[in-house]
Amino acid sequence: MAAKQKNYATETFTDPERIRNFCIIAHIDHGKSTLADRILQMSGVVEDRDMRDQYLDNMDIERERGITIKAQNVRLPWVPKTGAHAGEELVMHLIDTPGHVDFTYEVSRALEACEGCILLVDAAQGIEAQTLANLYLAMENDLEIIPVLNKIDLPAADPDKYALEIAHIIGCEPEDVLRVSGKTGEGVSELLDRVCELVPAPVGDADAPARAMIFDSVYDIYRGVVTYVRMMDGKLESRQKIQMMSTGATHETLEIGVVSPEPTKTKGLGVGEVGYIITGVKDVRQSKVGDTITWAVNGAETPLKGYQEPTPMVYSGLFPISADQYPDLREAIEKLQLNDASLTFEPETSVALGFGFRCGFLGLLHMEITRARLEREFDLDLISTAPSVVYRVVKEDGSEVMVRNPSDWPGGKMREIYEPIVKMTVIVPAEFLGATMELCQSKRGQMGGMDYLSEDRVELRYTMPLGEIIFDFFDQLKSRTKGYASLNYEEAGEQLADLVKVDILLQGDPVDAFSAIVHRENAHWYGNKMTVKLKELIPRQQFEVPVQAAIGSKIIARENIRALRKDVLSKCYGGDVSRKRKLLEKQKEGKKRMKAIGSVSVPQEAFVAALSTDAD
């Protein structure tokens, strides 16, 4: 490596003409973090000896699952060797975005902070549904789009075929699609030169009152909330009083700086720059993502175009396995919420599982990751109940109830029930088209249309109830398409539905943890599945236990757990049959009495196993 050059990017108040803000949009596993690693290395801000894979993914769980969850940002120096700006010292801000469907909200924030984006597509797989969704978001924001094929070093890569596919989608020429390899570094410097040439410089009024947009905030144990901002107008300096425009709260900036690639303190931030602000606030909800920061005195009048607050789509109960971990769970969720503004929670009690929390998530992956982080980072053992969505129930008297939890389902007659629906896009290889359409139909999907992206890849569009997707749709889709399908969905309002609440009764008593709201057609299937499952999982008692599934007072499925019997005749060697009968009658009476007063204890493992979704 050449002698280490001075990182001039750590100096702020750069002339906006020399700044380029861009992000990378890609599907999971298309090599975005690897490309970001190469960019960091080539610009010289990370020395080879400090390099580690997925440099920007700080959470263990991100590195382990190979996905990016939080948007990270880095400020880099770059001197292009080609193009109109060859030889100029430019400053680039790379904002790394997550690629998963649940985190579309995080992507939309990162896009607001950029003027251009690199559309990164795996040269062996082609464009995926979620990448398409994020690409349309970028187009809505009028970003300059630079199409790139990654992983051209792979033996299975077919860059010519996929260059045509991308050109067809975004309307460029196939030869405009750049070819790079994040792994070997081939083509990366040409890509950065192209970014400098095509991405427009940020525009803003340097003399106007400051307006900075928050696009992320993270919680640091030592310094409180670190807020990442993009300056639109004016400038911010340290030791300055600032105001959050949505809440009106005022703070003082204790430290202001840039990430290059470690946080570096600077004098302040000017137009078009991306950096961080620390105010010593301890609550992330004080610095809401999408909010505008301005000066507390003589500040801006109008805030920047904000975002929508993220709305939870999926709800699930989280309960500690041992009741004494409840305070720890509360503390842990509060700490996670500091970093994750889209997580909502409220206390909940369950007869079967004790005290816990009803949490709202953006989607299934968000739920899984939150649970994994709670268990790993805070050392908790948790049970999560089956996920559910929000239903709107209109009762007979016209009053409305929002049902987030099966136990809130109103009794009596109901006039109308509405369930949330989503518009879903699935991209599958043509050979799996039949199996995929069959699956979507079985989940009450209505087809909206289909397009062939190339001769062997099809895009399907469906409208489908969200409740059908959250359970095991994704797993089934992957297994029917050998893992080649990709899926994206966005909310699309609600529709009337014929839904019922199925209760699972043990010895005539409902167990709230197993209740579910399902479509009337699927009620028998769910009832049979749960009763059979519980029959296997609950240990046999001294008396017979009926396991029933019911809709209201109507029983729709039943299994019996046979009683354990002691052999009362073992001491009778021969003798009169009436003696044997007397002993058996006595045992029968005892069992009857036990059944009347006995209660069934359900072991923890049975809850965990019964609530875990499976493929059947």
From Swiss-Prot:
A GO cellular-component term linked to this record: plasma membrane
UniProt-recorded Gene Ontology molecular function terms: GTP binding; GTPase activity; ribosome binding; translation elongation factor activity
KW Nucleotide-binding (keyword) present: yes
Keywords: Cell membrane, GTP-binding, Hydrolase, Membrane, Nucleotide-binding, Protein biosynthesis
Catalyzed reactions: GTP + H2O = GDP + phosphate + H(+)
GO BP annotations listed: positive regulation of translation
SS bond list: none
Membrane topology listed for this record: Peripheral membrane protein
Subcellular locations according to the entry: Cell membrane
Cited function: Required for accurate and efficient protein synthesis under certain stress conditions. May act as a fidelity factor of the translation reaction, by catalyzing a one-codon backward translocation of tRNAs on improperly translocated ribosomes. Back-translocation proceeds from a post-translocation (POST) complex to a pre-translocation (PRE) complex, thus giving elongation factor G a second chance to translocate the tRNAs correctly. Binds to ribosomes in a GTP-dependent manner.
Protein name per the record: Elongation factor 4
Annotated organism of origin: Corynebacterium jeikeium (strain K411)
